[in-house]
Amino acid sequence: ALEPRFATEPGLVVISPATPGSNGITRAFRERAGRHYVDTGIAEEHAVAFASGIARAGGRPVLATSATFFQRTFDQLQQELSLNGTPVTLLDFGGGLSGADNTHSGAFDIAMFGNIPGLTCLAPTSGRAFLDMLAWSTSQSNTSPVVIRVPGDTILNRERSGDLPGDAQDVTDMGSADDTCSNACSEKTTADGTATCPWSRYRTIRRGTTV
């Protein structure tokens, strides 16, 4: 999704704090990306500050790492991203109850990111939604920091299978997508009152703004 834009967007930079392999950043991609890819080493705090500097200079940086490692960057998320409002995109891998050990548990990502003022938090429920969100967050129309909770294999495998939830009798929605979900389901409601909203998503946004 990002690679085709490198030729025309010199400020589009992918950053990894020494976790490229576990975040889908292959060796082949890194070689093709050239200066559009930077590995900061095991220095997540520096990676966030570095990304904020790129964004402040007009670039569109994308920082990818595991949810558990973002915990080390809380100070930089507050001081570098929140206070400056820089349009950095954070790709949050392994969020929620994931991983097979305590070290790589991403259970605290929403609690942490949700307490960073001005940080837009998105959780796509499909691969397509993820790519759409990534395209928006790295575009010039976005002017603030964004974190995207990258969907895992369970979601992606279900999407590939085409097994969508249906035959719903009730619609449950929560958060700022409330009205949008309700309106969409209302328009699709059948004569017997059945409605389905299969691709609902969680997000937190700044008061008074819409995405």
Question: Whereabouts are the PLM-identified features?
Answer:
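Condensing-enzyme catalytic core mediating Claisen C-C bond formation in acyl metabolism
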Residues: 156-177
